[in-house]
Design a protein with these regions (language model features):
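Sec-dependent signal peptide cleavage junction
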Residues: 19-33, 298
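Short, well-ordered beta-strand elements
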Residues: 32-43, 61-67, 133-135
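Short helix-initiation/N-cap motifs at beta->coil->alpha
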Residues: 65-76, 164-191
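Alpha-to-beta junction loops
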Residues: 79-89, 133, 156, 177-180, ...
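Ligand-binding "clamshell"
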Residues: 96-108, 121-123, 195, 200, ...
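A conserved helix-loop-strand patch within extracytoplasmic ligand-binding domains
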Residues: 108-157
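A bilobed periplasmic-binding-protein/Venus flytrap-type ligand-binding module shared by bacterial periplasmic
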Residues: 115-126, 231-244
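Periplasmic-binding protein-like
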Residues: 145-152, 254-274
Length: 298
């Protein structure tokens, strides 16, 4: 009789483990209770998540948001399984982190991007640029490249072919007015606006400087730009959990019209909902081309 009971318990445990690991997705105890634990940066990520809480609650999910003030721990706590997801980073940062730290994090969905903009300093229009004027840009690799690409898109400079999202000042091929590019830490760029012709800022620093992207920028990245697609801020999860019910619910709400409206109204262009329709269109086109090639081969 005792042996029969032990077999029953063992069978129950085995079935439970099988259910928890079905399709390679490990469901945490918190997920069973309807709780989604997310690590996030304060602005705008945690603010957006707070707006999503009541919507998720209506769907039966409790959203537990913890704010982190660094860019390392949010990934480590997701890798360890202590948190279900994080919301603070873009894809290049995630890829680099995985490579350097040996983690296994993946993109579960793009939510927003923070567009770079060119803002007035001592000059109001790019047409007012004169020989030897100075433009201030961030000096870190990622943000400097975005700034230089934006200047190129607006006819200020020309970069070498292929420079792309790794461009530096050394890649400037044409500079008709010999504009001086002053490289500063990102947080310092807006502080020299009274000393230079223009400053090039990311959305969050534009907000801190009192700029409105939609009203004050002379030019800014668009939602279909290479930079927007590359530097979209994402929900990141441990590999294998991207298709879990909880994560899909979270991403769906963050991409809903309610959250898009909140982002547009609150951040006035400094934070923009990511529109992946163009990306999907590109993917569909690529698939159609592949099918056409297959038919031709047949």
């Amino acid at each position: 009789m005792r042996t029969k009971k032990l077999l029953t318990v063992s069978l129950t445990a085995a079935l439970t483990i099988a259910a928890l690991t079905a399709n390679g997705v490990i469901v945490s105890a918190d997920a069973e209770k309807g709780t989604i634990k997310v690590a996030a940066s304060a602005t705008p990520h945690a603010e957006i998540l707070e707006e999503a809480k009541p919507i998720l609650e209506e769907e039966g999910w409790e959203l537990d948001v913890t704010v982190f003030d660094d860019y390392v721990q949010p990934n480590l706590v997701v890798e360890s399984g202590d948190f279900d997801a994080n919301y603070f980073q873009h894809i290049p940062y995630l890829d680099n982190f995985n490579e350097e730290q040996g983690t296994h994090l993946v993109n579960a969905g793009g939510i927003h991007y923070e567009p770079f903009g060119i803002y007035p300093g001592t000059k109001e229009k790019l047409d007012d640029l004169e020989e030897g004027d100075t433009i201030a840009v961030p000096n870190d690799t990622t943000n400097e490249a975005r700034a230089l690409l934006l200047l190129q898109d607006n006819g200020v400079i020309t970069l070498k072919d292929g420079a792309g999202l790794e461009a530096t000042v050394k890649d400037i091929e044409e500079n008709p007015k010999n504009i001086k590019i002053e490289e500063l830490e990102a947080a310092q760029v807006s502080r020299v606006k009274d000393e230079v012709a223009f400053v090039v800022l990311n959305g969050n620093y534009a907000l801190q400087a009192g700029y409105s992207v939609s009203k004050d920028s002379i030019a800014h990245e668009t939602s279909d730009s290479e930079a927007a697609k590359t530097y979209v801020n994402i929900i990141a999860v441990k590999e294998g959990n991207e298709d879990s019910e909880a994560i899909k619910a979270l991403v769906d709400v963050l991409k809903s019209d309610e959250i898009k409206d909140f982002i547009n109204e609150k951040y006035d262009g400094a934070v923009v909902p990511f529109d992946d329709s163009a990306e999907n269109t590109d993917a569909d086109a690529a698939e159609e081309d592949t099918e056409a090639e297959t038919e031709d081969a047949e």
